[in-house]
C-alpha cells in the first residue's frame, strides 16, 4: 500500500461580513504570521470534516464550531487520501479514518488528536483487505470498517498508543440482490454497535440484509480473542431491492431506524436484546432517485432526518411518536448537491450538511418544536466534504 504522507498546515478562518441580503460564508486562508488558535470557549466544539481527495481537498479539515451561534473557525488541514468516514475515540484523543480506494491502497488510519489545537498526527495505517472501506467505528479496543466493494468487514485491535495492529479478522459475505446493477454482490455499507454494547449490526446493501454479531467486549490487542461471533439469527432480511445503507438508534435505545439507499425508504424497528422487529416502512425519497444517504435522530429523540441525493437533493423530516417509535413525515428541506452525510449539534440547535458536489457544508438552524430546518447562509467551504464529526471540548478555566 502506498504510504500515506501526512502534513499539517495551519490556516486562518476568512470571514466575509455581509450587509442586508448578502450571504456570509467561510473558507480556508493559509496562516503566515499567526499561531493556531488554542484553547476552547464555552459552547465550542471541535469539528472534523472528512473528504474525497480527487479534487482540491487535501484530506481532513478541523474547525471550532460554536453550537450556540452557528459560527465556525478554521483550525488545520491534514493530508490523507480519501478519508471519507471518521470515528472518534471516547476520550477524544484518537481519530480513526478510512482511506477509500478500490484497490490495495484501501486502508484504516490512526491519528493522535490534539484537542487544544485541533491538529492530527498520523500514527499508522493498516490495509483493510477489502476494497472501498466507507464506514468506520471503534469500541475503544478495536476498530471496525465496512468495506463496500470488498463485501466485507475488517477488525483491527488497537495498541496501547492508539495505533492499529493488522486486521485480526476479515469477514467476507456472499450473495446478491434483485437490482442487477447495484446488488450484483455483497456491499457492506455500515457497521453499528447496539446501545447495550452487546451486538454489532452490519448493513449489506447488496443482499438486503442486516448481519448480526455478538460482541466479545474483552477482546483486545493483548489477549487476541475474537471480537465478533455470528449471531442468531445471523441476519435480518428486509424487502428485496431496498439496499440497506445506514442504521441509527433512538436515544432511549428502544428503536432502530434504517435508511435504504435504493428504495428510498426508512424502516423502523423495535430493538431488544439483539433482535430487530420491523414496525413500519415509510418513504423518504419520493422521486425514486435511488440515492438515499444518511440518517440521524435529534438529541431529544423527537425527530428523525434522512438525506436523499441524485434528484431533489435534501433532507426528509419525520416526527417520532414517543410511545411506539412510529414516524410521521412533517417536512422536506432542499439542500446543496449530494448531501452524503450530516450531523446535529449536541444541543440540537443546528444541523450541518456535507454537500459533496456543492463543495460546502451548509448550516441549518433546527426548530426544536417542529423539527423544520432554516438555512442560516453560513456555508463552510470545503472541497468534496462527505463526513462531519464533533468532538466536545473542555471549557477554559
Kindly label every feature range from the protein language model.
Residues 56, 80-90, 129-142, 174-196, ...:
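Beta-rich, blade/repeat-based domains predominating
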Residues 73-78, 121-126, 175-181, 231-237, ...:
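A short beta-strand motif characteristic of beta-propeller blades
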Residues 74-140:
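Blade-loop segments of beta-propeller domains
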Amino acid at each position: 500500500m502506498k504510504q500515506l504522507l501526512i502534513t499539517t498546515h495551519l490556516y486562518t478562518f476568512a470571514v466575509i461580513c455581509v450587509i442586508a441580503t448578502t450571504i456570509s460564508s467561510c473558507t480556508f486562508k493559509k496562516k503566515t504570521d499567526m499561531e493556531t488558535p488554542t484553547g476552547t470557549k464555552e459552547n465550542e466544539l471541535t469539528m472534523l470534516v472528512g473528504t474525497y481527495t480527487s479534487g482540491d481537498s487535501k484530506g481532513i479539515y478541523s474547525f471550532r464550531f460554536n453550537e450556540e451561534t452557528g459560527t465556525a473557525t478554521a483550525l488545520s488541514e491534514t493530508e490523507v487520501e480519501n478519508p471519507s468516514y471518521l470515528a472518534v475515540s471516547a476520550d477524544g484523543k484518537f481519530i480513526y479514518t478510512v482511506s477509500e480506494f478500490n484497490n490495495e491502497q484501501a486502508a484504516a488510519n490512526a491519528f493522535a488528536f490534539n484537542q487544544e489545537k485541533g491538529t492530527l498526527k498520523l500514527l499508522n495505517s493498516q490495509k483493510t483487505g477489502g476494497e472501498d472501506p466507507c464506514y468506520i467505528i471503534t469500541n475503544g479496543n478495536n476498530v471496525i470498517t465496512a468495506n463496500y466493494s470488498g463485501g466485507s468487514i475488517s477488525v483491527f485491535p488497537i495498541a496501547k498508543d492508539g495505533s492499529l495492529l493488522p486486521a485480526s479478522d476479515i469477514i467476507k459475505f456472499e450473495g446478491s440482490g434483485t437490482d442487477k446493477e447495484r446488488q450484483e454482490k455483497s456491499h457492506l455499507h455500515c457497521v453499528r454497535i447496539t446501545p447495550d454494547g452487546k451486538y454489532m449490526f452490519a448493513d449489506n446493501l447488496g443482499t438486503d440484509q442486516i448481519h448480526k454479531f455478538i460482541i466479545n467486549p474483552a477482546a483486545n490487542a493483548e489477549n487476541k480473542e475474537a471480537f465478533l461471533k455470528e449471531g442468531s439469527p445471523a441476519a435480518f432480511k428486509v424487502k428485496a431491492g431496498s439496499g440497506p445503507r445506514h442504521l441509527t438508534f433512538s436515544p432511549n435505545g428502544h428503536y432502530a431506524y434504517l435508511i435504504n439507499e435504493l428504495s428510498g425508504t426508512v424502516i423502523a424497528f423495535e430493538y431488544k436484546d439483539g433482535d430487530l422487529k420491523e414496525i413500519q416502512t415509510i418513504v423518504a425519497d419520493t422521486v425514486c432517485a435511488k440515492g438515499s444517504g444518511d440518517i440521524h435522530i435529534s438529541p431529544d429523540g423527537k425527530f428523525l432526518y434522512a438525506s436523499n441525493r441524485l434528484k431533489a437533493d435534501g433532507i426528509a423530516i419525520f416526527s417520532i411518536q414517543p410511545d411506539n417509535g412510529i414516524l410521521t413525515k412533517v417536512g422536506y428541506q432542499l439542500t446543496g448537491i449530494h448531501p452524503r452525510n450530516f450531523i446535529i449539534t449536541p444541543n440540537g440547535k443546528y444541523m450541518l450538511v456535507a454537500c459533496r458536489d456543492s463543495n460546502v457544508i451548509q448550516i441549518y438552524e433546527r426548530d426544536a418544536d417542529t423539527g423544520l430546518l432554516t438555512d442560516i447562509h453560513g456555508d463552510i467551504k470545503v472541497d468534496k466534504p462527505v463526513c462531519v464529526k464533533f468532538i466536545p471540548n473542555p471549557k477554559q478555566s
